[in-house]
């Protein structure tokens, strides 16, 4: 909770929320903050009353909502569509938005259907017949992110390429581990490390050249400089 608040306040103080990817990151941090507060409240005040089943239900919803990028998909698809100031191909919308919506509906209705997870007579959490759908869908998003990163690699700096690849590899490895043995604590750790990677990617505290010279885009800066030199010649 403290780290989430510090990061959010830091971004607002520095007014570093202009780019689309930074706004997506801030939205993810807000979701992290809210889900963590909910978890603390449930564990601290209601765990003796709601039982293990509802506690696990909360954990699954909060962490998988983070893992499947709820803020980016829904906020940008819905708000920008409503305001009609963002070009988003319908084919892309269907390919990304519809599968995610189906999985989210399965998750929300699972107490009634038992498809994603079920509750044993001892009020213990057990995986349902469609639990694997989370891993399949998330794997699709991770592969898509890799392909996008490769196709757009010319616009990324070396630091950004390394951090993005580390982020995706970490999430992919964590999913494999989780598919073998469920551990909600490990999911929380995974989310924290993922947020650290995103912070390094966006805030860039390690790159001395960019930090000192306040150059956000080395390639763009180089292109402009070369054009000016040609004009002078």
Identify what each model region corresponds to.
Residues 216-233:
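Short regulatory alpha-helical coupling segments
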Residues 1-2, 57-69, 126-139, 188-194:
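Alpha-helical transmembrane segments of polytopic membrane proteins
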Residues 17, 79-86, 118, 153-160, ...:
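Membrane-interfacial segments
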Residues 1, 103-147, 184:
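Extracellular-loop-to-transmembrane junctions of the mid-late helices
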Residues 44-48, 75, 79, 182-187, ...:
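A cytosolic-side transmembrane-helix exit/cap motif
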Residues 6-11, 73-77, 135-156:
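Alpha-helical transmembrane segments in multipass membrane proteins, preferentially the mid-helix core
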Residues 1-79, 96-113, 164-179:
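Hydrophobic alpha-helical transmembrane segments of multi-pass membrane proteins
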Residues 147, 151-211:
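Interfacial "cap-and-anchor" motif at the non-cytosolic start of specific transmembrane alpha-helices
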């Amino acid at each position: 909770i403290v780290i989430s608040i510090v990061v959010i306040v830091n971004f607002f103080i520095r007014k570093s929320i202009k780019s689309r990817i930074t706004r997506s990151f801030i939205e993810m941090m807000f979701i992290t903050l809210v889900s963590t507060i909910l978890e603390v409240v449930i564990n601290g005040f209601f765990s003796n009353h709601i039982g293990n089943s509802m506690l696990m239900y909360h954990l699954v919803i909060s962490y998988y909502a983070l893992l499947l990028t709820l803020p980016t998909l829904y906020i940008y698809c819905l708000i920008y569509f409503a305001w009609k100031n963002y070009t988003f191909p319908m084919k892309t919308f269907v390919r990304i938005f519809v599968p995610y919506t189906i999985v989210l509906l399965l998750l929300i209705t699972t107490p009634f259907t038992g498809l994603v997870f079920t509750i044993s007579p001892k009020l213990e959490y057990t995986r349902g017949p469609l639990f694997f759908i989370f891993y399949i869908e998330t794997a699709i998003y991770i592969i898509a992110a890799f392909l996008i990163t490769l196709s757009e690699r010319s616009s990324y700096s070396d630091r950004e390429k390394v951090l993005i690849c580390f982020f995706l590899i970490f999430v992919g490895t964590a999913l494999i581990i989780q598919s073998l043995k469920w551990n909600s604590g490990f999911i929380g750790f995974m989310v924290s490390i993922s947020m650290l990677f995103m912070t390094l990617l966006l805030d860039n505290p390690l790159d001395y050249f960019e930090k000192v010279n306040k150059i956000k885009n080395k390639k763009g800066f180089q292109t402009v400089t070369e054009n000016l030199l040609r004009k002078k010649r």
